[in-house]
Regions:
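A membrane-interface helix-boundary motif in multi-pass transporters
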Residues: 128-144, 325-343
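Cytoplasmic helix-loop-helix junction between adjacent transmembrane helices
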Residues: 78-114
């Protein structure tokens, strides 16, 4: 929820309290997602779990909207984190199953594009009409959307999530596959900064006197420019090679954070948002391909889970908690400066790993 930090600040919570509430979501999600996976796989109830999770998010958001007490919000935040954890994974599996049944599996990119368009419309509308005077309404809106999603999920076909995640075996990879371990260190450092920007961008824009519509446009730009770039990944890799595409995409992040630290005109933030799309294309497509070719097939699901944990679980959780404390004591500029340092370190680590241990020759054939 891109506006949650802004809402929590508006009701008077301290930076530390905000950091705790924000950090819980990726951390809990990381911890419970394997449990959801086991429940779904063993009982073959992926669709039922998706429906239940959507309705669970609905309940948690109704609770969130009904109180400003920190302890109660902590409870509803944990509930929300637990319930939202399986939605992305199972939703993707169901979508792919539907497309495969209709001989349209290559159309998955189009579905993702519609998701980005929906997100762009939502964040622009919230930014333009709710942020300035009625930000509380993000919770009822989010709740209703998840309730509707649960109803829609009742009608979609069943699907199996293929690729067993062996967590014990996966963790042992960090000791056996040193290349993967080094790579994940860099990804972890990058993940710290991404968790912060996903939650504090709205706070930052308000701090530099940005209007609600500017916040909405900034978030919409990030979403709308992401998918077209992802669709061009095979072309980029064929022309420049996977190493350059991966490292160059990640390298824009320290530049982005540094620019944030020194910009005080909210309109100048808008063109910088394109850098987000470049980086996410690298991290959500190219880096995944790189990790996939480091491992034998039976360990790829576990390797990808470790990658996701570093980028979207442990990294963001630590970053969000630290950002709350730093923001309270020193303001948002120092947050961005430290993000620049972390992202630069992460970029250097990733660059060293991918150039020291280049992709296997067969990888290029697979990508092409």
């Amino acid at each position: 929820m891109s506006f949650l930090a802004l809402y929590l600040a508006s009701i008077g919570f301290s930076g530390t309290q905000i950091g705790v509430l924000l950090a819980i979501v990726p951390l809990i999600g990381f911890l419970v997602q394997p449990l959801w996976g086991v429940l779904s796989d063993v009982n073959h109830i992926h669709k039922q779990v998706l429906v239940f999770a959507c309705f669970g998010v609905f309940v948690s958001m109704i609770g969130y909207a009904s109180t400003e007490d920190f302890t109660l919000l902590l409870f509803f935040t944990i509930l929300h984190a637990i319930m939202r954890a399986p939605i992305g994974l199972i939703g993707t599996a169901l979508a792919l199953e539907f497309l495969e049944q209709n001989d349209s599996k290559d159309s998955f990119g189009s579905l993702r594009l519609w998701g980005s368009i929906g997100f762009a419309i939502a964040v622009f509308g919230i930014g333009a009409f709710l942020v300035d005077d009625a930000i509380w309404w993000i919770f009822p809106i989010y709740a209703v959307c998840n309730f509707a999603l649960g109803l829609v999920a009742l009608s979609v076909p069943k699907a199996e999530v293929h690729g067993e995640v062996l967590w014990r075996e996966g963790l042992s990879l960090l000791f056996r596959e040193r290349v993967l371990a080094y790579f994940l260190v860099g990804v972890f450092l990058i993940g710290i900064t991404l968790g912060i920007v996903n939650n504090y961008l709205a706070v930052y824009l308000v701090d530099i006197s940005g209007a609600g519509w500017v916040i909405g446009v900034a978030l919409a730009i990030s979403a709308l420019t992401e998918v077209p770039l992802m669709a061009r990944v095979p072309v980029f890799i064929k022309r420049w090679g996977i190493r350059l595409v991966l490292v160059a995409g990640v390298a824009v992040l320290p530049v982005r954070w540094l620019l944030y630290a020194f910009i005080d005109n909210p309109l100048l933030v808008l063109p910088i948002q394109v850098l987000h799309s470049i980086a996410m294309t690298s991290l959500l497509v190219v880096a995944i391909l790189y990790v996939d070719r480091l491992l034998v097939p039976k360990l790829r699901a576990s390797g990808q889970s470790l990658y996701t944990a570093a980028l979207q679980g442990i990294g963001p959780s630590i970053g969000l908690f630290a950002a709350g404390i730093i923001y309270q004591r020193a303001g948002i500029d120092l947050v961005w400066l430290l993000c620049a340092v972390a992202a630069l370190a992460g970029t250097l680590v990733i660059g060293f790993v991918v150039y020291r241990y280049p992709a296997k020759p067969e990888m290029q054939k697979t990508i092409s």
